Amino acid sequence: MFQFHAGSWESWCCCCCLIPGDRPWDRGRRWRLEMADTRSVHETRFEAAVKVIQSLPKNGSFQPTNEMMLKFYSFYKQATEGPCKLSKPGFWDPVGRYKWDAWSSLGDMTKEEAMIAYVEEMKKILETMPMTEKVEELLHVIGPFYEIVEDKKSGRSSDLTSVRLEKISKCLEDLGNVLASTPNAKTVNGKAESSDSGAESEEEAAQEDPKRPEPRDSDKKMMKKSADHKNLEIIVTNGYDKDSFVQGVQNSIHTSPSLNGRCTEEVKSVDENLEQTGKTVVFVHQDVNSDHVEDISGIQHLTSDSDSEVYCDSMEQFGQEESLDGFISNNGPFSYYLGGNPSQPLESSGFPEAVQGLPGNGSPEDMQGAVVEGKGEVKRGGEDGGSNSGAPHREKRAGESEEFSNIRRGRGHRMQHLSEGSKGRQVGSGGDGERWGSDRGSRGSLNEQIALVLMRLQEDMQNVLQRLHKLEMLAASQAKSSALQTSNQPTSPRPSWWPFEMSPGALTFAIIWPFIAQWLVHLYYQRRRRKLN
């Protein structure tokens, strides 16, 4: 009988085309060889895992629990000896009883399944074990088993990361919009709101005015372009707002000079965009003697039930007004904003630089614009949202009082502007062209803004220094009090030469009192005996 070995006679016959390679008996033999290979893989992994467990030191950094060792023991016995056929140990062997229970609980599990379970339990604790030669050998035999974990969680992790990235990007966009545009007042359905509310104020405006048409994609692009140049949402004031100049510097309107409707293409594009979004554009021409307002989408008077109420959300606004008061008190360009006369007409007093356009040449053709969100009317003495939120008082000048109210709703502000003598008056325009000349327009608005920031920074530094001074004084007082307490502590009665912690009197009492007690007991028994006798 010839004995054929794999890879010798059969392979030679297949190469010589004597025996076809796809015969049924050949395929069955290949299947048996593959099963043997798979069995050998499980066995090699099992043997490597057993070596790792056996090589663990008794006092090493990794100490498996008793339950874990019982699992490994039961799987090892099942993989090597098969199902448990031994009798249960007696009560005097509790460890043997625990082992027998763990082994018999596996039932009729096959050896291959026990090997696989042993290796799977090893994978759970493989990361916590120290890296040794046996562990490296086991890792080499097992292979990259972490791919399964990554494949299971890859879809969820990608979804979570995408959602988080979207939320973060949205928050960053909202924060950028808030930082790019300072709080500017705008009116929606006769109520004034500020533009620092971001997305929520837009949603509120949409709820209050549902009939307003939604802007198209082209309109949105135009609004983004106009917002890049500067925010157009400002309100014309008569000079009584302290913060209007600083906010107007950041929101100045860059337009070209025009007279009787002659504007450049830039202004026309902005006007068309504002017509689509339902905004009110107010143009002030200095060559017109009568007060008028060119309103595109209608005029609506500002009314509110809480005109006399004043609200403030934070103390930061009071600090901003105090810094502005100190800055305006000096002789500078800010003196114009508080030195005006309330009885003086708006057109003759001139407008602050917050609503000036491009610096002109002093001619009366310079055009000023004020854009107000929605339908509204800009009154004399109108204040913007960022300046009135921190003013809990009424200003009365020359018999004329102004009531301010700023109500926080969501993240936006509401305010109502009232003036007793001129509630029905609108923003007019005068012919005083000197106020609109290049002298005031050419002043660097950036210098004033930097000066204001420096003043606020200086105030913050002063506050920090005051706090540090208070902390130093508190620490010094605590040190003095602790020193006084230590000096006032009573001195111990024991002398310096005494070696024990107890005082000499306490030590002598502790030694003598047993003898005294014994003597008293002895006296008691003596008297008792005498009485009995």
Curated annotation (Swiss-Prot):
Modified residues (N6-acetyllysine): K470
Cellular compartments annotated: Peroxisome membrane
InterPro entries reported for this sequence: ACBD5, Acyl-CoA-binding_prot_CS, Acyl-CoA-binding_protein, Acyl-CoA-binding_sf, FERM/acyl-CoA-bd_prot_sf
Disordered, as annotated region: 182-227, 339-443
Keywords for this protein: Acetylation, Autophagy, Coiled coil, Lipid-binding, Membrane, Peroxisome, Phosphoprotein, Transmembrane, Transmembrane helix, Transport
PTM annotation (Phosphoserine): residues: S194, S195, S197, S201, S244, S314, S429
Spans traversing the lipid bilayer: 503-525
Any one GO MF annotation of this record: fatty-acyl-CoA binding
ACB domain residues: 42-131
Coiled coil: 448-478
Biased composition (Basic and acidic residues): 208-227, 374-383, 432-442
Membrane topology: Single-pass membrane protein
BP terms from Gene Ontology: fatty acid metabolic process; pexophagy
Binding sites annotated in the UniProt record for an acyl-CoA: 53-62, 73-77, 99, 118
Tissue expression summary: Highly expressed in brain and liver. Lower levels of expression in spleen and heart.
Keyword Signal on entry: no
GO cellular component: cytoplasm; peroxisomal membrane; peroxisome
Family the UniProt entry places it in: Belongs to the ATG37 family.
Functional description taken from the UniProt entry: Acyl-CoA binding protein which acts as the peroxisome receptor for pexophagy but is dispensable for aggrephagy and nonselective autophagy. Binds medium- and long-chain acyl-CoA esters.
Protein name: Acyl-CoA-binding domain-containing protein 5
Species this chain originates from: Bos taurus (Bovine)
Gene that encodes it: ACBD5
